[in-house]
Amino acid sequence: MDFSFSSEQTLLQDSVERFIQNDYGFDQRQKLTGSELGFSKEHWSHFAELGWLGLPFAEEDGGFGGSAIDTMIVMEAFGKGLVVEPYVSTVLMAGSALAHAGTTAQKESHLAAIIGGEAQASLAYIEPQARFNLNHVVTRAVPDGSDWVINGFKGVVLGAPSADLLIVSARTDGDEQAEEGITLFVVPANAEGVSRRNYPTIDGFRASEVTLSLSLIHI
């Protein structure tokens, strides 16, 4: 059994490691973590130009149809450089949720913007009472005509300070610990009724506590 990389994967590895070596020295990273934004928009645009933001997504969704090994190559190099750009929160968490659960219209709009580097997104799913039980969702969404009204709180939403979109888990049926009845909603981060308390994490990333109060979401 051959575990060596393909020629394309070797080129990808060389490309990402070259970026880390040339553009992500310790002093450069320190400047980024100390900035107001916490990362570099120029780096993010560079990721889009090189196709890294579209790497794990299917070709029919505008991505490059990369494998888990391709993503591992990028993440291994990012780990070496302690990269603080919100790749995990936007691409691997929120982006994957959109790719697997989003409608065709949501993919064409939001996923395309993520792949192009034009938008960032965060997956808002952690609630303080849940501990590690992902079924324990108190945030609730109730229908209002063709809209949904969402009320609740999400903690440690990685990448949320810079996010344009929040992928929010909310209960639409059942009691607060039921396995069924949880729905994901695409919520504009600047929507009325959405507030964020932003803070830096110990490893240099940014996160938010997100409160949704009578947030009206059109579906």
Pin down the residues of each PLM region.
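A structural signal for short hydrophobic beta-strand segments in well-ordered beta-sheet cores
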Residues: 139-141
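A short, Trp-centered hydrophobic/proline-enriched beta-strand micro-motif
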Residues: 117-126
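Internal helix-loop-helix
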Residues: 49-108, 112-117, 159-165
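Buried hydrophobic positions in well-ordered alpha/beta secondary-structure cores of metabolic enzymes
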Residues: 9, 20, 51, 58, ...
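Conserved small/polar residues in nucleotide/adenosyl-binding loops
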Residues: 217-219
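A short core secondary-structure module
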Residues: 151-195
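Intrinsic disorder at enzyme termini
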Residues: 1-8
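Short secondary-structure junction/hinge motifs that connect adjacent elements
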Residues: 27-50
